[in-house]
Amino acid sequence: MAIIIPKVKTNGRIKMRIRKGDIIQVISGKDKGKIGEVLRTLPNENRLIVEGVNLRTRHVKPTSGGESGRIVTKEAYLHASNVMAYSTENKVASRIEIMVDSDGNRKRRLKKTGEILA
């Protein structure tokens, strides 16, 4: 009789070139074309939250006696493969490359424009 061993998902951290604070453009999905700032990243799941993109509506019940119920709209996670870094100066989305300057420091740069990201 064969023993079945389930595949275990590794909790390895995925290298993401997009970081918190970057300006990105959504390249696929229902919010395609939208531009926003990255608010939070989840490197273990390769996901991120972008300001004003992938909004979800939730109906919240009142918690105390005098309070009324409300509708809350907040951003949900996006997969990192659905976004690209965006240059606000040149109005173009681009991939990110890692370059090493003369001092040996690694910097992120947009491939299309050559703009260095902070």
From Swiss-Prot:
Subcellular location: Plastid, Organellar chromatophore
InterPro entries: KOW (IPR005824), Rib_uL2_dom2 (IPR014722), Ribosomal_uL24 (IPR003256), Ribosomal_uL24_CS (IPR005825), Ribosomal_uL24_KOW (IPR041988), Translation_prot_SH3-like_sf (IPR008991)
Keyword Nucleotidyltransferase: no
Keywords: Organellar chromatophore, Plastid, Ribonucleoprotein, Ribosomal protein, RNA-binding, rRNA-binding
SMART domains named among the record's database cross-references: KOW
One GO term describing the cellular component: plastid
One Pfam family hit: ribosomal_L24
Keyword Plastid (UniProt): yes
Family matches, as CDD domains: KOW_RPL26
Record GO biological process: translation
Molecular functions (GO terms): rRNA binding; structural constituent of ribosome
Function: One of two assembly initiator proteins, it binds directly to the 5'-end of the 23S rRNA, where it nucleates assembly of the 50S subunit.
Entry-linked PANTHER family: MITOCHONDRIAL RIBOSOMAL PROTEIN L24
Subunit note: Part of the 50S ribosomal subunit.
UniProt record similarity statement: Belongs to the universal ribosomal protein uL24 family.
Protein name from the UniProt record: Large ribosomal subunit protein uL24c
Organism encoding this protein: Paulinella chromatophora
